[in-house]
A protein has these predicted regions:
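Helix-to-loop junction immediately C-terminal to a conserved catalytic motif
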Residues: 55
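Catalytic Walker B motif of ABC-type/P-loop ATPase nucleotide-binding domains
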Residues: 150-154
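The feature captures the beta-strand-to-loop junction immediately N-terminal to the Walker
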Residues: 40-42
Length: 285
């Protein structure tokens, strides 16, 4: 396929550990700006190795990587949660490494942690956080650094349903804002990402994955209060979603991949977001 300017490119990448068989056997991959690539594959197939090389934390045995963005937001497969420093200090440290404004980065990370349902205090040492909260800190450091390349290894692992929906929206928004996005996912959640390209890594080679099931995308239910008439608000938001006035409130059913755009549009209208919850599987569409 043609490679767009600014794309991350892995060219004939091989990776071998010692005398073991090759983990990657001549992988070619391009991830363009505003593109999402989802890599699946069995355990031990080399997905994490592929992402480490893409992010720059590991080198290929042979082959080369070109076009890597100057700032990479990277969530590794084993995010280090054994640090003694408080989570807030860790996030400030990563922001400084990425040359981000400290105050702006802290605000952005705090907003994302709240949206993901982080429980407790960021003054708690990383080693004292639960696995789920540590994962959310890892996501915050990766997603809040204005990265041109986003590399996320199993980002939905350990997240509850509401947090998973929030992450879907943030990943889609990062691509919309111009980032190249490369993720792995064994939960099936990434199937809801809009316009993502799905690949499978097996036997050291990348191949297009079988087509995803054609069922409807998962929905979230958004409840709003808007300063204008609910019917007018519903009409204004109609391009995004099916909307239904409910008294002085507005209840909307939106595909998860479009929820971030809808929430931005609602805030632009002056609406208050009352709740965002996963829709029941048998909810009307």
């Amino acid at each position: 396929m043609p490679v767009r300017p600014g794309a991350l490119r892995l060219e004939a990448v091989h990776k071998r550990y010692g005398r073991a068989p090759e983990v990657l056997a001549g992988v070619d991959l391009a991830v363009a700006p505003r593109e999402i690539v989802v890599v699946a594959g069995p355990n031990g197939s080399g997905k994490s190795t592929l992402l480490r090389i893409a992010a720059g934390s590991s080198r290929p045995t042979s082959g080369r990587v070109r076009g890597r963005a100057p700032v990479v937001g990277y969530l590794p497969d084993r995010f280090s949660a054994q640090l003694r420093m408080p989570a807030a200090v860790y996030l400030r440290h990563l922001a400084a490494l990425h040359r981000e404004n400290a105050a702006a980065a802290a605000e952005s990370a705090g907003e994302l942690l709240e949206a993901l349902g982080f429980v407790g205090s960021t003054r708690t040492p990383m080693s004292g956080l639960s696995e789920g909260n540590a994962q959310k800190v890892g996501l915050a450091q990766a997603l809040c650094c204005s990265a041109g390349l986003l590399v996320l290894d199993e980002p939905w692992s350990g997240l509850d349903a509401p947090a998973a929906q929030v992450l879907l929206g943030r990943v889609a928004a990062a691509a919309q804002d111009g980032a190249s996005v490369l993720v792995t996912d064994h939960t099936g959640t990434a199937a809801a990402l809009p316009r993502a390209r799905h690949l499978r890594l097996q036997g050291g080679e990348l191949r297009p994955s079988p087509p995803q099931p054609n069922g409807p995308a998962p929905l979230v239910v958004v409840e709003l209060w808007c300063p204008l008439d609910p019917a007018q608000a519903a009409a204004a938001l109609a391009p995004f979603v099916r909307a239904a006035p409910a008294g002085d409130r507005l209840v909307l059913h939106v595909p998860v991949g479009r929820s971030d755009a809808l929430l931005r549009a609602a805030l632009d209208l002056g609406c208050s977001i009352l709740s965002v919850t996963p829709a029941a599987r048998d909810a009307p569409r």
